[in-house]
Amino acid sequence: FLPILGKILGGLL
């Protein structure tokens, strides 16, 4: 899992 995607998901959550 890419940290970039995690950052995006974290922003949405």
Curated annotation (Swiss-Prot):
Localization of this protein: Secreted
Record's keyword annotation contains Glycoprotein: no
Keyword annotations of the record: Amidation, Chemotaxis, G-protein coupled receptor impairing toxin, Mast cell degranulation, Secreted, Toxin
GO cellular component: extracellular region
Modified residues (Leucine amide): 13
GO BP term (any one): chemotaxis
Chief location bin: secreted
Expressing tissues: Expressed by the venom gland.
Annotated GO MF terms: toxin activity
Keyword Secreted carried by entry: yes
Family per record: Belongs to the MCD family. Crabrolin subfamily.
Purpose: Mast cell degranulating peptide. Induces the chemotaxis of neutrophils. Its mast cell degranulation activity may be related to the activation of G-protein coupled receptors in mast cells as well as interaction with other proteins located in cell endosomal membranes in the mast cells.
Protein name as catalogued: Vespid chemotactic peptide T
Native source species: Vespa tropica
Upper taxonomic lineage: Eukaryota, Metazoa, Ecdysozoa, Arthropoda, Hexapoda
